[in-house]
Swiss-Prot record:
It comes from Homo sapiens. The keyword Membrane applies. Disulfide bonds join 265-290, 267-283. This is Gamma-sarcoglycan. Interacts with the syntrophin SNTA1. Cross-link to form 2 major subcomplexes: one consisting of SGCB, SGCD and SGCG and the other consisting of SGCB and SGCD. The association between SGCB and SGCG is particularly strong while SGCA is loosely associated with the other sarcoglycans. Interacts with FLNC. PANTHER family: GAMMA-SARCOGLYCAN, SARCOGLYCAN. It comes from the Eukaryota. Residues 1-37 are cytoplasmic.
Length: 291
């Protein structure tokens, strides 16, 4: 409380003070003062609680000058130790693991990796789901350690760059269209079978088709006819013995039949030719073919 008194004094003159003195009170009193103190006390309590929560959060989250917990900030980017769970999409230029450990990506639903262009459109996608792995791109390629293409797929063709393509399934390999390859070979001590259940099987090559069995036999079975046709060359059966075990045996017919009969003749070099049959052999008469 402040009191102000106005008194005029002159040297040598005494002036009596007035009986009524005016007192002016400046400040906050009563319930307003109590509310102000209560508000200040509440601010102090909130400040202390905030400071305590800040210290607790810093301690729980493992904040340090290098980063937060297992997440460290380096000059090359962010380094994350241990296992982490991302609840929202992760955008990064490069993700790699430590030198002494592998990189593991897992999810309860699927793992999707997208590549986008400058306009935000998806240009490539790799989706690993519970039932299949889906790749969406113009070309899919697998390379070896030295950069050699091992497997390439695009809209036009599938290229296998390995030295050998091995199919181990019990049903083999099923091709709906043509297959182009320089060699078809079975595993050692296993049979090689080429089959077309409902259509024909064709093997074409501009410089010849070579079929060889080193330790077994080659068998061709057909319900209908088996035809060997050579337009410009000849058919060669190169073997010590040529057997035709199921040839139909002829029967005696009426004499003087007009039906033309021929006999098979063999040249010294193995060439076969037909000769008109007679009472005796006529091969000698047509042996000019062997010359």
């Amino acid at each position: 409380m402040v009191r102000e008194q106005y008194t005029t004094a002159t040297e040598g003159i005494c002036i009596e003070r007035p009986e009524n003195q005016y007192v002016y009170k400046i400040g906050i009193y009563g319930w307003r003062k109590r509310c102000l103190y209560l508000f200040v006390l509440l601010l102090l309590i909130i400040l202390v609680v905030n400071l305590a929560l800040t210290i607790w959060i810093l301690k729980v989250m493992w904040f340090s000058p290098a980063g937060m917990g297992h997440l460290c900030v380096t000059k090359d980017g962010l380094r994350l130790e241990g296992e982490s769970e991302f609840l929202f999409p992760l955008y990064a230029k490069e993700i790699h693991s430590r030198v002494d450990s592998s990189l593991l990506l897992q999810s309860t639903q699927n793992v999707t990796v997208n590549a986008r262009n400058s306009e935000g459109e998806v240009t490539g996608r790799l989706k690993v789901g519970p039932k299949m792995v889906e790749v969406q791109n113009q070309q899919f390629q697998i390379n070896s350690n030295d950069g050699k293409p091992l497997f390439t797929v695009d809209e036009k063709e599938v290229v296998v760059g390995t030295d050998k393509l091995r199919v181990t399934g019990p049903e083999g390999a099923l091709f709906e269209h043509s297959v182009e390859t320089p060699l078809v070979r079975a595993d050692p001590f296993q049979d090689l079978r080429l089959e077309s259940p409902t259509r024909s099987l064709s093997m074409d090559a501009p410089r010849g088709v070579h079929i060889q069995a080193h330790a077994g036999k080659i068998e061709a079975l057909s319900q209908m006819d088996i035809l060997f046709h050579s337009s410009d060359g000849m058919l060669v059966l190169d073997a010590e013995t040529v057997c035709l075990p199921k040839l139909v045996q002829g029967t005696w017919g009426p004499s003087g039949s007009s039906q033309s009969l021929y006999e098979i003749c063999v040249c010294p070099d193995g060439k076969l030719y037909l000769s008109v049959a007679g009472v005796s052999t006529t091969c000698q008469e047509h042996n000019h073919i062997c010359l």
